[in-house]
């Protein structure tokens, strides 16, 4: 295991995606709250707004949107980087020099995405809840302590567990697909662009597929 390269990839992924994930998380929390308020107010259920929005954000919206951002930023980057190394024969040169390209390039990137995507989801969840608090305060005068109390009345470990668990699978899939598309790149620079594009498309599809499977498993095992 190339630990130095793995740590480097973790920092690279964090620096590449954290600002976008943080901003998107805040906006998601704010927008979902603003859009949910009229429907809940129509039924006189405004007091349930923090609870409903927090569960929706943590269980479904934030993990999926964060994974899609990572698929676009990280998946395409890995596909393009390894594709470029493939067409310029840098990977062949690594094999000739005695370096295992799969350990150095593939394993480190897959493990980095598998670790970092859940961490980004947790960060985005936290920021999204602050965005939701701003949205609630635009409609109601609610103290932060009361807001947090209302959130954790309904938001439980059974909401957080499926979210974090499927995020590990999102990260693994994004890294594995990016590496696979990069390693099978052909046809020079045109192939590099195709590798990056196909990595994003396939990663996006797999993210939704994993999310569907996770939802079904949560329902089967009554993690609701």
Predicted regions and their residues:
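N-terminal, non-cleaved signal-anchor transmembrane helix
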Residues: 1-16, 187, 221
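Start (N-cap) of specific transmembrane helices in multi-pass transporter permeases
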Residues: 100-121, 195, 199
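Hydrophobic alpha-helical transmembrane segments of multipass membrane transporters and ion channels
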Residues: 15-27, 62-67, 115-124, 161, ...
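Helical hairpin unit composed of two closely spaced alpha helices linked by a short loop
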Residues: 196-214, 218-224
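Membrane-interfacial helix-loop-helix connectors in multipass membrane proteins
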Residues: 35-58, 126-168, 176-196, 218-224
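Hydrophobic alpha-helical transmembrane segments of multi-pass membrane transport proteins
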Residues: 49-92, 120, 177
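Short cytoplasmic-facing helical segments at TM-TM junctions of multi-pass membrane proteins
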Residues: 82-107, 189-192
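Active-site cofactor/substrate anionic-group-binding motifs, chiefly glycine-
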Residues: 9-65, 69
């Amino acid at each position: 295991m190339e630990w130095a390269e793995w740590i480097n990839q973790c920092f690279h992924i964090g620096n590449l995606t954290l600002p976008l994930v943080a901003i998107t998380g805040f906006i998601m929390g704010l927008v979902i709250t603003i859009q949910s308020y009229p429907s809940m107010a129509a039924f006189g259920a405004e007091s349930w707004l923090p609870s409903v929005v927090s569960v929706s954000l943590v269980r479904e919206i934030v993990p999926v949107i964060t994974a899609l951002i990572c698929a676009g930023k990280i998946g395409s980057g890995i596909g393009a980087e390894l594709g470029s190394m493939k067409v310029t024969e840098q990977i062949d040169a690594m094999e000739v020099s005695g370096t295992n390209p799969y350990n150095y390039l593939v394993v480190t990137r897959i493990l980095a995405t598998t670790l970092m995507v859940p961490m980004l989801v947790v960060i985005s969840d936290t920021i999204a809840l602050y965005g939701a608090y701003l949205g609630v305060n635009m409609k109601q005068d609610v103290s932060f302590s009361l807001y947090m109390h209302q959130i954790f009345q309904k938001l439980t470990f059974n909401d957080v567990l499926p979210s974090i668990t499927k995020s590990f699978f999102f990260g693994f899939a994004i890294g594995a697909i990016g590496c696979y598309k990069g390693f099978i790149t052909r046809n020079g620079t045109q192939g590099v662009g195709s590798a990056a594009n196909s990595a994003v498309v396939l990663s996006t599809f797999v993210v939704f597929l994993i999310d569907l499977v996770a939802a079904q498993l949560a329902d089967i095992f009554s993690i609701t």
